[in-house]
Amino acid sequence: MAQKEEAAAAAEPASQNGEEVENLEDPEKLKELIELPPFEIVTGERLPAHYFKFQFRNVEYSSGRNKTFLCYVVEAQSKGGQVQASRGYLEDEHATNHAEEAFFNSIMPTFDPALRYMVTWYVSSSPCAACADRIVKTLNKTKNLRLLILVGRLFMWEEPEIQAALRKLKEAGCRLRIMKPQDFEYIWQNFVEQEEGESKAFEPWEDIQENFLYYEEKLADILK
């Protein structure tokens, strides 16, 4: 079973983007956190290391992780076999569109209908039901698109609605996988800003392999 958050951690203040929030005993501060205003979708090529370490961690209970981070690789292949690749990341926080929808709204419009596209997403958690529905509709009408989604955690996987949505993704031809430790290392090397004084090598957290196996089993049970 995946590592649960320790009791001490549960007693600590909620965090935003991996940074601790102080003075939560202040009623006004609590109100600010509960009534967060909409944020814009953020795009870029590399995300801060502390975001990655907090948001992508494959824990069972994702307390405080109220964003979706989506790192993407787009490979476009012409009829002649030439391949062009691009990559970047998207993040959301209480935005109108989730990161998955933002990809379709801001990245996909640049696609050339004459090319074939293989898109890989590395997402901090699996899609919600609404985003899964959007993915299914997009795949059904975009015949030159193949999509592989690798997720760090399963979002609300015990909910029947979520389970049904994940099965629909599979039926639509979307390949859905749980991230292995090697996938987290790939993100670290290719999508994370290497801050001054930060170790260049990826340092796996405790139970990363155990948690991968836990989620892999859950996903297999859902998709069978």
Swiss-Prot record:
Catalytic activity: cytidine(6666) in apoB mRNA + H2O + H(+) = uridine(6666) in apoB mRNA + NH4(+)
Active-site residues annotated for this sequence: E100
Residue sites binding Zn(2+) per the record: E60, H98, C128, C131
Keywords for the protein's UniProt record, in alphabetical order: Hydrolase, Metal-binding, mRNA processing, Zinc
Gene Ontology process terms (BP): cytidine to uridine editing; mRNA processing; positive regulation of gene expression via chromosomal CpG island demethylation
Protein name: Probable C->U-editing enzyme APOBEC-2
Oligomeric and partner information: Homotetramer.
Region (Disordered): 1-25
Cofactor: Zn(2+)
Phosphoprotein as UniProt keyword: no
One GO molecular-function entry: metal ion binding
Similarity comment text for this entry: Belongs to the cytidine and deoxycytidylate deaminase family.
Bound cofactor: record note: Binds 1 Zn(2+) ion per subunit.
The CMP/dCMP-type deaminase domain, residue ranges: 64-169
Superkingdom classification of source: Eukaryota
Key word Hydrolase present: yes
GO CC, alphabetical: cytoplasm; nucleus
Originating species: Bos taurus (Bovine)
Entry's EC annotation: 3.5.4.36
Role according to the record: Probable C to U editing enzyme whose physiological substrate is not yet known. Does not display detectable apoB mRNA editing. Has a low intrinsic cytidine deaminase activity. May play a role in the epigenetic regulation of gene expression through the process of active DNA demethylation.
Membrane-crossing residue ranges in chain numbering: none
InterPro entries: APOBEC_Cyt_Deaminase, CMP_dCMP_dom, Cytidine_deaminase-like
